[in-house]
Amino acid sequence: MYSIDVPFEYSSQSVSYLEGQLREMVKMLEQVTGKKMDEDKLKEVIKRENKTHAYMNRYIDVLRYKCHPTTLTLEMYMLFVTHTFMGTQQTLRFFEILMDEMESFPDSKAKRVFWVHIVPFYPHGLKRYFNYSQHYEVLGLDLNFDYLEEMDCDNPYRALAIKMILNHGNGPYQRKIGSIMNIIDRLQPDGVIHFCQWGCKQSVGGMMLLKQMLDERGIPFLALDGDGADRRNHYEGQVNTRLEAFLEMIGKRERCL
């Protein structure tokens, strides 16, 4: 096992420190497996990731006004292509197809919500309101847009180190707020829902800071407490009551475009 220490702050020194760890990890894997790392293939992966990021940024710009039929589960499962399989030909093709589809969709007339943190997959109330709905649409999860910058494919280890440090899940919570607000400025949602997973300090601990920023912008905000993994800790009635009140509130507001 090799444990990577990702620095909290971003600086030239912290990037070099993390880059050194990545190179050391590769050497360890080469010794264990008896296989040599092909850096040219790694560079090709970074190139595909850059192409994918370009499609993702186009997707965000089009999503601002286009209708995009989706479900909460599909948005959560998109984490596989934006993280686990990022840099593969399949992920690049996924976003190429998605962009082709988006061009054919009509402009949206629904009230639109941006989701922060994970989506619980089992609550029927949430599914009833958002899945393939003509009235309320989920524009996406912040987790899928946590790093969209172009990477230096000629220096893949350093590029990966920068990506890991600047990911909005790392470092001060202000970094995450800045990343989320950047996406919100581009998507212009009618409201934001933050799911606060029980025991998740990364999300619950900074939630009020995000709420304060959204309040200053006049963007409606709803925090839903729950457990995305264990339905026994989910209170359907309470969640539905708060969600319905929130949707009624944004329903009375003029569209934010």
What are these regions (language model features)?
Residues 1-39, 141-257:
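Trp/Phe/Arg-rich N-terminal binding region typifying the photolyase-homology
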